Amino acid sequence: MSYSLPSLPYAYDALEPHFDKQTMEIHHTKHHQTYVNNANTVLESFPELAKFSVEDLIKDLDKVPAEKRTFMRNNAGGHANHSLFWKGLKLGTTLTGDLKAAIERDFGSVDSFKEKFEAAAATRFGSGWAWLVLKDDGKLAVVSTANQDSPLMGEAVSGASGFPIVGLDVWEHAYYLKFQNRRPDYIKAFWNVVNWDEAAARFAQAK
């Protein structure tokens, strides 16, 4: 079984004016597709890896032969991260219920959570991601990872751990056509397109 580019559950212009059509289309069909294609070259050479989901593979990169481990960390990581990212975007959803209560419990308020998340996204040097994760102790935390690392890879690999609830891509390819060097503006725009329904479902799944 090879990896495939997931279809988006919305049109490329569905998140306008916050995320623009051109960026969404290029990001999905060019950048994400490249991660899929690259990861599939390893699955072709090592077909025993094809039985694992991309999430299970990046949770235990020791499954991958040493000479391809960094390559798959980057490319399988990119496939997993982007697959989560697309599902996590939607106009018009609201943070409610158990997830909102847990955010208020662990951060003090929703605004305090947003401040921490924005800081993690803005201060990630170079390329990477900001995440809201559920830790093993049952508490929510904000973390960031470099490049295409995921919290699923664990502290030893990515410097972060936890089950991803919300993720934001802060690679320049995610925002540069619309926002140029104004990463903080892109981060602020993200709050208009977070799919809180998907986040709540992931939180319920992870609990």
UniProtKB/Swiss-Prot annotation:
SUPFAM superfamilies: Fe,Mn superoxide dismutase (SOD), C-terminal domain, Fe,Mn superoxide dismutase (SOD), N-terminal domain. GO terms for cellular component: cytoplasm. Mn(2+) binds at H27, H82, D169, H173. GO terms for molecular function: metal ion binding; superoxide dismutase activity. Keywords: Manganese, Metal-binding, Oxidoreductase. Binds 1 Mn(2+) ion per subunit. It is an enzyme of class 1 (oxidoreductase). Its EC number is 1.15.1.1. Its cofactor is Mn(2+). It catalyses: 2 superoxide + 2 H(+) = H2O2 + O2. PANTHER family: 37S RIBOSOMAL PROTEIN S26, MITOCHONDRIAL (PTHR43595), SMALL RIBOSOMAL SUBUNIT PROTEIN MS42 (PTHR43595:SF2). Destroys superoxide anion radicals which are normally produced within the cells and which are toxic to biological systems. Belongs to the iron/manganese superoxide dismutase family. This is Superoxide dismutase [Mn]. It comes from Yersinia enterocolitica. The gene is sodA.
